[in-house]
Amino acid sequence: MSGPNNIFDLGKMAMSAQMVRMNTLASNIANAGSVASSPEEAYRAMRPVFETEYFGHIGDLGTLATSRAVDVVQLDREPESKFLPDHPLADADGFVYASTVNVEEEMVEMLEASREYQNTLEAVSTMRTLMSRTVAMGK
């Protein structure tokens, strides 16, 4: 992939990465209360995997870096078994298996992703304002 052409491209890439993160978290929260008839079928929380991309020579003044989502993986957590013999999804022993989503953890992650998105948006907006003022000075 070619590097960003300007600060707006860099902001777009960073905001896109945070959107992947927020969409994954939203999916986790939506499936938090789900149950299944076996541990294999139970919903497992997911997390995006990010990769840092550098544009220019690392260590040089003016080197740009951003991150991008390269994959979404399931967390390695075992679903909790609950004894609910009257539940329609209960197995032969009367157990259902709950999703591995921790709603509090997901909400903290969502808040962090939202703030990172907002910070990037503010940086891009500030850069746009500075560019506009610079152009206005030349008139």
Language model features: what each stretch is:
Residues 1-139:
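Amphipathic alpha-helical polymerization modules
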